[in-house]
Amino acid sequence: MTKRFPTPDYHFSYRIPPVSGNTINGLGETSPRRARQVFHGSGARKLEWVALEMFFGLTMPLHIFIRNALNRWELRKADGPLARKRTPVPDSAEMSKQIKSIAKQAGAGAVGITPMTEDALFEGQTADYQTAIVIALPQDYETMKAVTTVKAAAETVDTYRDVSRIVMALAAHIRSLGWRARAYGESADLLHIPLAINAGIGQLGKH
């Protein structure tokens, strides 16, 4: 009796065939398009690598997992109600100075303001705001030199939490003036790097 085997391209071990990173990143495509979310999705669409992200989360040490979960919980305050009365802004340059000052008082290391651009949006998203306020926060240099250690991982998660707290406080202040504002403490909703470059905070690394 002749044995019959499935062809090599038959995905007999997957309910959903895996998608490579090259495919997600558009390797070989000739037309420009927006980026697609890979990890830490906002929930706008099901991510191809969601199982790997879950594995990554479940394998981290418990105290780091808890810190990360707390950050996600705190980000529920990213948006909120507006003040009933809107404060006029006759001088946008002066207001920009005030916003930057408030952000630095809250702990930001650097602050920049830039228009929202197409390259900061993931595929399928729309711009809810015309302007982005971008902050940067330094990390402990000596700790991050050992980036693969648990201590460095804790420093990274703590920095995420610090950034979230700063931008949530800043957004709450803007809403208290009667203007819409939402805090984006993580990169699940927006691409932070293009905005940071446009805001004058830094430049794209070559690594």
List PLM regions with ranges.
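Iron-sulfur (Fe-S) cluster-binding modules
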Residues: 1-113, 123-128
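Catalytic cores of enzyme domains
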Residues: 93, 100, 104-207
